Design a protein with these regions (language model features):
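Short beta-strand/loop motif that positions the catalytic acidic residue
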Residues: 198, 204-206
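Active-site loop/oxyanion-hole signature of alpha/beta-hydrolase fold enzymes
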Residues: 43-83
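Flexible "cap/lid" loop of the alpha/beta hydrolase fold
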Residues: 97, 104-134
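Conserved HGGG/HGGXW glycine-rich cap/lid loop of the alpha/beta-hydrolase fold
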Residues: 1-54
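Gly/Ala-rich beta-loop-alpha elbow adjacent to hydrolase catalytic centers
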Residues: 84, 88, 92
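Acidic catalytic loop of the alpha/beta-hydrolase fold
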Residues: 209-213
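Conserved alpha/beta-hydrolase catalytic His-Asp/Glu region
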Residues: 117, 138-184, 193-194
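Catalytic active-site module of serine/aspartate enzymes centered on a nucleophile-bearing elbow/loop
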Residues: 228-260
Length: 260
């Protein structure tokens, strides 16, 4: 599949992989400008099921891993540094299992190698809503996304949360076939044992107030990876890379500098 991508900057390449429903432009708000100034070539792309391919369905984790590998090869990025979040982190982990020669190092934010009981129940609820065909009012959809995305500190800061309320209300998530299929791009079994064979240097970042993929699940991934490190950032929810971009960017750039 010909996925839309953006390629800018010069230097060692960094491939950014977005989470469920996130377009490549997600990274252009806080990450791409900083990383290009730091001397990196930044490549972002729309995952299958997003943007021009939102009507796609029936694809699997293996399909999306293949998409990512094909883009790396098409742009001659290998071995590439990867920065990923949520579903994107899971794709990156499975890429490192299947095609380790393509990856130089990886930053895995808000990730997991298995689902605990709570996250499995959340997944069942999301799936039930998607299959019901019910369309939530934009304001209620925004409420849920705010609670899932940010820390209490941000939610209780009138100034910080104002723009997010407006943005989430104005741009509700569309229940497209692609978005529904993204629900299946997740561990269907415990994958931690498979990650014990991945020797690629990896930094796992957990966001302390993340209720979608809480930090203890990310710490498990870091512990499974032979060359894994773990960092937990306080006062951040699932979108911590947007909530505290300076802290996150500094941690990633320092990790890259340590793994030249």
């Amino acid at each position: 599949m010909n996925l839309a991508f953006d390629d800018r900057g010069t230097g060692d390449p960094v491939l950014f992989i977005a989470g469920r429903g996130g377009a490549g432009r997600t990274w252009h708000l806080h990450q791409v400008p900083v990383f290009t100034r730091a001397g990196y070539r930044c490549v972002t792309f729309d995952n299958r099921g997003i943007g021009a391919t939102e009507a796609a369905e029936g694809f699997t984790t293996e399909t999306m891993v293949g998409d990512t590998a094909a883009l790396i090869e098409k742009l001659d990025l290998a071995p590439v540094r990867i920065v990923a979040v949520s579903m994107g982190s899971y794709i990156a982990q499975e890429l490192m299992v299947a095609r380790p020669e393509l990856v130089r190092s990886a930053v895995l934010m808000a990730t997991r190698g298995r689902h605990d009981r709570t996250r499995d129940f959340f997944w069942q609820g999301e799936k039930a809503l998607a299959e019901s065909g019910i369309s939530l009012p934009a304001e209620f959809d925004a409420k849920v996304r705010l609670l899932e995305s940010f820390s209490p500190k941000t939610l209780n800061d009138d100034t910080a949360v104002r723009d997010w309320i407006d943005m989430f209300t104005m741009w509700p998530q569309k229940p497209t076939p692609g978005m529904r299929t993204h629900l299946t791009i997740a561990p269907q079994e415990n994958r931690l044992a498979a990650y014990q064979n991945v020797t690629i240097p990896s930094l796992v970042i957990g966001f302390a107030d993340d209720v979608v993929l809480p930090p203890h699940l990310g710490r498990e991934v870091a512990n499974a990876l032979p060359n894994g490190r773990y960092l937990e950032i306080p006062d951040t929810g699932h979108l911590g890379f947007i909530e505290k971009p300076e802290v996150v960017n500094t941690a990633i750039l320092n990790f890259f500098a340590d793994t030249l």
